[in-house]
Structures are given as C-alpha cells and as structure tokens.
Amino acid sequence: MSDRVEVNERRSDSVSEKEPARDDARKDVTDDQEDAPPFMTANNARVMLVQAIGGSLNGYSIGFVGVYSTLFGYSTNCASFLQENSCTTVPNADCKWFVSPTGSSYCGWPEVTCRKEYAYSSPAEMPGALARCEADSRCRWSYSDEECQNPSGYSSSESGIFAGSMIAGCLIGSVFAGPLASKIGARLSFLLVGLVGVVASVMYHASCAADEFWVLIVGRFVIGLFLGVICVACPVYTDQNAHPKWKRTIGVMFQVFTTLGIFVAALMGLALGQSIRFDHDGDQKVMARMQGLCVFSTLFSLLTVVLGIVTRESRAKFDGGEEGRAELNPSEYGYVEMIPRLLMGCVMAGTLQLTGINAVMNYAPTIMGSLGLAPLVGNFVVMLWNFVTTLASIPLSYVFTMRHVFLFGSIFTSCMCLFMCGIPVYPGVSKKLEAKNGVAITGILLFILGFEVCVGPCYYVLTQDMFPPSFRPRGASFTQVAQFIFNLIINVCYPIATESISGGPSGNQDKGQAVAFIFFGGLGLICFVIQVFFLHPWDEERDGKKVVAPAIGKKELSEESIGNRAE
C-alpha cells in the first residue's frame, strides 16, 4: 500500500511540475496566433515553393500516363491517317497506303485491315460483321464506333503495367521516406529526387525514340522510388517550418500543385495531340510530339534539383542538431503504441485511392472517349476542372477543420461513384446513349469536385495531424505505403478488370466501367463509417503520455509549439 501511495505521489508531483509548462505553452500558442505574420511572408513563401515544385513534379508524373498512352495509340493506328505521306510516316506501326481502283484509297496494315475486311453496308449486316470480327484474333470490335478495328496502342495489361510501374516505385520509396528524410534532411532529399527525376526523364526520351516499352517502365519505376520520398518530405517540411497559423492552409497546397502538374500534362496533351492533322498529306511528327511531352518531366526534375540547393534546412531536428532548432525524440513513441492510428491511416489511404481517383486520372482519355468526347479534349476538361476545384480547398482549410472537410468529401465522392458513375452506366439501365453519357460525365466532374476540394488536400495534412510530432515522419511514411499499395492495385487491375468484366476487348466496356465504380462507391462508404467514429487528429493533452521524464538541455517540440490543432 505504501509503495502504491509513493508512486501516486511521484506521479502527482511530475504532473504538477509539468502543468505550468503546459499553461505557458498554451499561452505562447495564443500569443503566436494573435501576433501571426501575414500569409505572404518570406518564410511562408519558401515553404510554399517546396509544395509548388514537389507537388508539380508529382502531378505531372501522374498526368503523364493518360496523355502518353493516347499519343502512343495515335502512333500505332494506321486507320487514323487519311493521306499517303502521313500514312507512311507513322512511327510505331508498319502502315501501308492502299490505292483502290474505285478511288477510295486508305491507310491500313499489310496483313489485314479489319475495318475493310469486315465492313458492312446496313444495320442488318452489323451482327454478322461483329461475329466475324470477334472470330479473328487479329481484330476487335469497337462498340463506340460500331466497326471492326485493328488493335492499336497499349493492351490492357501493358496499360496496367505502365500506370502501375511508377506506383510500385513509390510504394518502395515511401517505406524509406520517413527515416531517410529524418537522417539526411529535407535539402538533400529534394536534391536526390531531382537528380533521379532527370535520369528517369532521359529514359523516357530513349524509350520514345527506340519504341522500347521496357525502358519506359524502368524509367517510371525509378522516378517512382523518389516520388514516394517527396510525397512524405514535402508535407513533413511544411508541418515543421510553416507558421502555426498558416500551416494547414499551406499544407493543402501540395494537392493544389499536384493537380496543377496534372493539368499541365493535360494541356500539353491537348496542344500536341489535337494539332495532329490526320487528313493532311505530310509527316505529322507524332514521335516528336511524344518527345515534347517528356520535356516537361525533365524541366520539373531540374527545378527540384534547384530546390534542393536553395531551400533552407528544416527547423526541426531528430536527436541533436544546431542550437536553436527544436529537437524531436524519435523513440518517444513506437509502432506498437501507434497501431490504432496506423490502422486509421490505412483507412484514410483507402478513401484516397479505393474510391477510384487514379482510375479517373490515368484513364481519363479512355473513359471520356467511351462517353463520346475526343480523348484528349475530354482529358483536358477533366484535368482543368480537377485543378480549378482544388483551389477552393485553400480558403476552406482556414474555415473548417481538416477532419470535417475530409469526412464530407468521403461520403460525397462515394455517392457520386455509386449513383452517377456506376449504376446509370450499366448496360440496360438507360436506353438513351446521350442521357447515360451526360449523367456519367456529370458524375465524374462532381466526383472530382468532392475529391479535390475535400479529400485530396486534407489527406496530406491529416497524415501529419494523425500522429504525435516525433512520430510524424514514420507515421506519414506508413500511411503513404498503404496509399501506394491501394494505388498500385487500382492502376494495374482497373484496365484488366474492366475488360474482363465486359467480356474481353470486343465486349461492351460500359459494363466493366460501371461495375468498377459501383465497387469504388461501396468501399468508400465503408471507409466513411469507420472514419466517423475513429478519425481524430492527435491531441497532446488527450492522447499524449501522461508521465514524461523532463529532458535536460533539450527543447521539446510538442503539438502546441509546432502547429495549431486541426480539430
């Protein structure tokens, strides 16, 4: 009994000694909020520069997939070119100009041109042409164009590998992102990302020139390794260096600039792809256009190298550092203690990825093409909307808590997947093609609105706020690993699954797309229910250790001293 009383006395002493410090900390935070500098200060601008360059490189790498795949499809589709010189200069296909005695000359393939071999002259003949087309392994039926076509571009498995290769690299890179950023610091992390990005971009150019798919995949994997690092390093740097009053607002900018990078890729695709004159009698230089798309990847990588040279090192250090910098103890919390929050990080990652955003981002040209728009025009519309809607997250981050905005976005995007993009698109639900396409396109735009205003920007802030300051690099790294696992599953499986559910390449692709979005919506609703009950940002008073030995000669960095509460 006496031992127990003695322990209680010691505990009460330690608490009483600590409470004045906490009161002082809260007072300091209040003073910091009242005396906060304007938003546009030199220090905040430096932090925003990190978000701008890191986010833009990340976004362009994401948006690169759909545009490059579409341009590559043009470079392998002989049927698109209507004049002899443009036909014979197609870079990645063995196209031949056929001269017909009747005057209907055309560009086709030496072995078989499916649209000519299985042509039909009346609607009554279409079922027979479809059956003969499907019986020929060299051809596939297009339900949107209602004709037999030669396969062009990447197959569904190649598309999945192309989209998933960078994500596989990001998955591996994010495993080491937290420890790496803590050990070598932010500046060296950015420098390494930029240098590796330049190497990967050179591989893009080489792959384009030689039409070597494996070189492209290796380049994507390599840049993914260090994009996994930057997706952790940029939010952590912002959390540690932005002024507490503006930390949340600057934090959402990583997603804003990610969407800007995606938009730049879409804009380049529109400029390079829509300017191809298929009916012009001359070389359309499709390969040069593909090379032009790769140039911006090189540019953003070089800017990241410059960022690593000119940016300041983080104010927070782990286990030592320069005098005057806040010190964090990485051993304060272990993975076992953080299991509940790590699991909630996985659920957040599920909301981010398993509701289908990357299916929309990577396959927007294909999806919008199947809904009646020109692929690159549809892609541009989607990505422009994607960027514009993200801007609304900046003022919202200062008015509402990150948790509330994230939860609203979770339920909203899930409902859009189910009731706008999924069920109405399923064959037989809508008898009018225009109505089906109109509802689906509206659903995709509303889905992007909810994701980019609410889910995406808040996610990167919550990956910090979910964990205590000393655990944030490791916690954010773990959450990013989960996010990239889900991302990889979606990118690789989406094209393969939709094609298989549709009944193969010649099946009605609307069926597979509808089932996929119904699946996304269902998973999103499950994640939403879990998050309503268990998603709560870290609160030092509520969640922190109640008994902590005072550190001698060290500056403790608590939640109150590095940022305002998110809830």
Curated annotation (Swiss-Prot):
GO CC term, one of those recorded: membrane
Predominant cellular place of this UniProt entry's protein: membrane
Highest taxon of the lineage: Eukaryota
PROSITE patterns named among the record's database cross-references: MFS (PS50850), SUGAR_TRANSPORT_2 (PS00217)
Keyword Transport: yes
Entry annotated with the keyword GTP-binding: no
InterPro entries for the chain: MFS_dom, MFS_sugar_transport-like, MFS_trans_sf, STP/PLT_plant, Sugar/inositol_transpt, Sugar_transporter_CS
Membrane topology: Multi-pass membrane protein
Family to which this protein belongs: Belongs to the major facilitator superfamily. Sugar transporter (TC 2.A.1.1) family.
Protein's name in the database: Probable transport protein
Species, as recorded: Leishmania enriettii
